[in-house]
Amino acid sequence: MARLLDSINSPLDVKILNIPQLETLADEIREELISVLSKNGGHLGPNLGVVELTLAMHYVFDTPKDHFVFDVSHQAYVHKLLTGRREQFSMIRTPGGLNGFMLRSESPHDCYGAGHAGTALSAALGMAVARDRVGGNEHVVALAGDAAFTCGITYEALNNIAHQTRRLIVVLNDNEWSIDKNVGAIANYLNTIVTNPRFDYLHESAGRFVERLGGKTALQMARKAEEAAKSILWPSVIFEELGLKYYGPISGHDVATLIKTFEFLKTQKRPVLLHVLTQKGKGFEPALQKQKKFHGLGPYDPETGETKALGQRTYSEVFADTMVKLANMNSKVVAITAAMPNGTGLDRFQPRHPDRYFDVGIAEEHAVIFAAGLATKGLKPFVAIYSTFLQRSLDPIIHDVCLQNLPVVFCMDRGSLSGDDGPTHHGLFDISYLRGIPNLVHMVPKDEDELADMLFTAMQHDGPIAVRYPRGVGPGTPVKDVPRAIPIGQAELLQHGEHDRVAIFALGSLVPLAQEVAAKLEGEGISAAVINGRFAKPIDVRMVEFYGRSVDAIVTMEDHVLEGGFGSAVLERLSDLGLQTPVVRVGWPDQFIEHGKPDALRARYGISVENTLEKLRRVLDQRAAEKIAHAAAKA
């Protein structure tokens, strides 16, 4: 039997369906999500929860003329299925396939790209204001999850919406089911009243009557009584205080009610907020039972939901276990996360030291300033935030931590590629945006044991210090029971010969690649030293000077953009020393890197043994030719 889903090539195909057909389509979409993501991985739970909601939005509105702005946009898979990308959906999050987030370059239906939380309302407001200025009539709908409302940017937007536009629809997708069923039932009943256009007319008429009857005092009393009732029955009076008309909460899985509600909201001449209750993971029992796991995950069994074990500890797990160890050693150690306890591994720390664990929500700036405050009172805060999300905290890092030289530790998970999540999540910029800040130390471990040592070093350091480490598993180096401190700014000489022609300075996960390059050179009769840089700042100037004066070429290798990175730091020091030693830099180019498997992406962008050797041979050949020419000139 043919699926309805197979006939959906654009939102126009959704609009011709009746309610029973839409409900059937919702079931088929869930089956498609479960099947495809079992192979590719992705954000299964959030997308299972927004199927009916997305169907209703496309049934009522007209993209791409109307604009849907998804906060984070990890819950946009259903939107992609309905907007001409159904045939490509099986390749989502695979090389050359659909991105797991919204991309303006991917489809005209994707009006705004995203990957970080809290951006939807500000972007949607910008679109609405631009529309108003040119006299457009398109609708702008911002869809944000309840987690986005822990993000300060969302409230900055809310504070401006009512003052800057009269037509904007905000959908609050509440998938935590935190509202009691009885309260929800009363609110739904009230919502059937307030979504009737006659309600606003009667409401305003009653207001005018009360004003004539008893003046403004009576009107103010009536409004206070209304607000008091709302505070009991409606949990979101704050939105109306900010100038948005609040509707809800309503079920996010009742497609008929959603359609009716959106049709009504289209007629409103003021900013509105619709509060929708959805169930994350709906339609897949394993996702309902383990919502954290199925928020975002790799491939899994589509029947049981079981995922394949990695076989060894990830860097995040090593970080978490080391944090527990450090907290046992030092009562001043505290841990902070910005709504990512599972992703950073701090969910292992929390049960062991609950009074020293702080989840501040999606509030990276607050996390850093909060840590600064803790540090002023003698505590040792470790702030665990993905490299890509720490970008949001640059001003507090400079102004509140480094300027005051406070001993805050920044633990930057995903400090490298983030694989299938793509450019919004790759952590390839932190060395560049942190290296120029006075007082800050920046470390990069080559393996799991060195990560533990660096965290121990950070605990003892009396000043701001950062450590970046990659996603996933490391080389499998055992972690010793007692970590040791590493002297600040001291690189590690891993191998060298009596007459090295090449010195390879490598950072972090590229140290093994450097050793492979050295082995290949050895096979060609070229001796090469390999140095584990360990510090992006301060770099080991003495080591750089020694090899800058003694070798024919230096190679730098980093899992980071070349602009302003570790290689740039080495070049700067050589320049300061007046040395002109040729430098071959290996790292990521000055562009945003697409999603894909890390090994494949590195090969594509030349972060490989072969490409490094090719570039190095050219430099060595040129150097040899210069020596011959110099000798001939002297003769």
Placement of each model-derived feature along the sequence:
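N-terminal amphipathic, basic-rich helices that act as targeting or association modules
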Residues: M1-T83, I238-I259, Q268, V272-T278
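Cofactor-binding active-site loop characterized by glycine-rich and histidine/acidic residues
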Residues: H43-Q164, Y315, K332-V333, T337-A338, ...
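Non-catalytic terminal/interface segments that mediate subunit docking, oligomerization
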Residues: D66-H67, R270, T278-L390, P396-L406, ...
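A glycine-rich helix N-cap at a beta->alpha junction
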Residues: E87-G100, H163-W177, R198, F358, ...
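Long, well-ordered, tryptophan-enriched scaffold segments
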Residues: N175-F319
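Structural signature of the thiamine diphosphate
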Residues: A218-P286, P407-M412, I431-D481, S608-A635
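Glycine-/acidic-rich phosphate or pyrophosphate-binding loops and their flanking alpha/beta elements
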Residues: K260-E263, H295-G296, T314-M329, G345-P351, ...
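Peripheral docking tails and interdomain loops at the edges
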Residues: P299-P302, T307-G311, G419-D421, L440-V441, ...
